[in-house]
Amino acid sequence: MGQKKLIKFAAIKEYNNVLEFPQDMQGKWAAFFDALKKGTSTIDISSLSISDGQFVPNVSSINKEDNASTPLTLELACGRGEYAVGLGRMFPEQHFIGIDLKGNRIWKGASIANKDGLKNVAFVRSQIELTSNYFAKKEVDEIWITFPDPQLRWSKSKKRLTHPKFLRLYQQFLKNDGIVHLKTDSPLLYNFTLKVIELYDLHLIYKTDNLYAEQNIDPRCLIKTYYEGLDIAQSNKIHYIQFNIDRDLPLALDEILKETIKDIPMDAGELLRMEAEAARAKKED
């Protein structure tokens, strides 16, 4: 690991707004943000108290109406956390958490949040697969998935963050009317997600295959990430979907999905990307 990465990993261990694989946090995020807003002292996560002796109430003692009125939004596979930070600036009365495994990327967003005094923005270093360990049932209001790896190979479709395997995971902590947002430059991931929504009869709120050509764009969609700027898919279009996971996703349909997604085509840019990835993997071998 390079020296710069080591420095960033060491830094986030000292940041109050970054938790790494946190334990015993289900239902306690309102208390955590309350502690974060009280000052810069080290937060003792195990008891949700501040080490200088100041008391921060457990989630059970927080006014339930206040807790319920503070929406909690996750940015999954957040990378540098542009969305968590951007949304935190837009909505200072709400709470935002970016989740990613790569600490050197999280460092960027966490550093900006600290510098700008955004006490409503935090980060969790973890695999997405573990998120149900960190949030209680119906604790999360919205999920943003922005420019994730589209996992172009058919054999890796289960790794796509809108695959039913992941939607079942999100359903464990997302509110019944909670919204999932997907923003991507990958036509394949966009069409795959629409296929999932259709097959499992989920509630589609909004879709567009050319976001910036739309009238009256949601200001939240104007936040741009580092990966959007790269335009890896070379599609020249940004695709966007809003939907609810408003019903159970039968496992029996997974096999049907497995067969139907074979017919979803890739555009030229995605084919080039897949060829480049294959060449890189071969070189590494």
Identify the residue ranges that each predicted region occupies.
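S-adenosyl-L-methionine
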Residues: 112-137
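Conserved SAM/SAH-binding beta-strand->alpha-helix loop
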Residues: 102
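SAM/dcSAM-binding transferase cores
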Residues: 1-65, 208-285
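A short glycine-rich, Lys/Arg-flanked "PGG" loop and its adjoining helix->strand segment in the class I
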Residues: 162-176
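A short acidic, Gly/Pro-enriched loop at the edge of an enzyme's catalytic core
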Residues: 133-142, 147
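Class I SAM-dependent methyltransferase "Motif I" SAM/SAH-binding loop
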Residues: 77-81
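Conserved SAM-binding loop
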Residues: 109
